[in-house]
UniProtKB/Swiss-Prot annotation:
GO biological process: ubiquinone biosynthetic process
Taxonomic path: Bacteria, Pseudomonadati, Pseudomonadota, Gammaproteobacteria, Legionellales
Record's bilayer topology term: Multi-pass membrane protein
Naturally occurring in which organism (per UniProt): Legionella pneumophila (strain Lens)
HAMAP family: UbiA
Pfam families xref list: UbiA (PF01040)
Superkingdom field: Bacteria
Catalytic activity, reaction form: all-trans-octaprenyl diphosphate + 4-hydroxybenzoate = 4-hydroxy-3-(all-trans-octaprenyl)benzoate + diphosphate
Pathway recorded for this protein: Cofactor biosynthesis; ubiquinone biosynthesis
The name this protein goes by in its record: 4-hydroxybenzoate octaprenyltransferase
Molecular-function annotations in GO: 4-hydroxybenzoate polyprenyltransferase activity
Amino acid sequence: MIPWNAYVRLLRLNKPIGILLLWYPTAWALWMANQGFPSIDLLMIFLLGTVFMRSAGCVINDIADRHIDRHVARTQFRPLTSGEVSLSEAFILLFILLCASLFLLLKLPINCFYFAVISVLITFLYPFCKRFFNAPQLVLGLAFSMGIPMAFIASGKNLNSDFIVLFLINFSWIIAYDTMYAMTDKADDLKIGVKSTAIYFASYDRLIIALLLIFLHSLWLVWAINKNVECFFYLLWCTAAGILTYQLKLIYARIPKNCFKAFLVSGYYGLVMWFAVGLALI
């Protein structure tokens, strides 16, 4: 019998926050590069590509961490670690996902291919960075930002100042929210030697997260002023600032379950700023 439920959990389809956090920056880029009106074809290609590559990343991560996950309370029952899905099944599933992603990539301009290759290479590298690099979130930041240049290129745009600002926003955002995520597993990671910015930043973790959030949210303001957008953007910008403030409140005591909740709340920030960009470009 095919373990469909286990496959769903292996791909994290039951926890769509990862897909959303990868999709929102790509959506921001698509809206910016197309003056608020991306084509349906581009939307479908990038949306499906986001789902396929995020799922592939989860499989790669679980293959690489299958011996580590059993020592972490939050991950010890993942399908590969528990034996619900075999290693060979995981590799077959990964192959299918990569083939599906390649099929979509062939519909995009050739220059998108180079960024896609970088994305795949970083995705394969990331799980192993947690073993020897003190700040693997920097690597994740690159992997989760590759959809931005691809969206601009696929839309026939150069990698202009909008791209640079958006890339910096997303890169900083990823480091911030994934540090919150890593704070959830900090105690277990210290025991087994897994590295993260939650450990590397030590007692400065909350301060650095706060500075990153202030920096990235200020960049949105710079972009908006430069574009001379309407007041609706600023209303949503203030709403998003409230979300960031709430996240900082959640992580203040460094309670694992609250840190994980703060990570999940990042999805609301991405959604609000998507609406903000959309309204700004109408």
